[in-house]
Amino acid sequence: MVYQMQEQSDLKVEIIMKPIAVSAIAVGIWLISPVPVAAQDARETLNACLSERIETEAQLLDCVSAAIEPCLSEPDDMNAVAALCFREARSQLDAGISAGMSDLRASAYDEISTLVSIELKYDILSGLLQCDRMEELAVALSEYDAEAIQRQKAQCQATTSGLAYARLTLRGREN
């Protein structure tokens, strides 16, 4: 913080806060605000959507969007809370991916589980690479602040995990 003193009839102190202090305030607000309950149920929401007939990639994306909807509905001025919500949803979905791969390895032929594992790995890697690309472009060329960019990246990562989980779940049903 920078303190600037001005002499007048009464002493005035102007405090200019740096972005780090603003981030600290946002984190403090997050600490007293609960993560949206539905973010904790991202996997359940996605499973419910996937239990319906899914025929296209667009329908998969709709299911993933429904799973992370509580995070999407966070106001624009709550970027830190939204980013945390997306990270929690991603964590739930990543746990589902791990469990799904364990189930697949236990129930499918080695060739099938190896094929699905390789496809899944590259689905995730290509998605995360696009998230990094979008972040780098936003930092270099946009007027968004750091928190908004982190929110976008967290959303992208949660969507990547959601799509990977959805594809794995559907592949598991085929075998």
Q: Model segments located where?
A:
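N-terminal signal peptide c-region/cleavage motif recognized by signal peptidases
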Residues: 33-34
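N-terminal amphipathic/basic-hydrophobic helices that include classical n-h-c signal peptides
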Residues: 1-16
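N-terminal alpha-helical modules
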Residues: 38-175
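Bacterial N-terminal signal peptides that target proteins for export
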Residues: 14-24
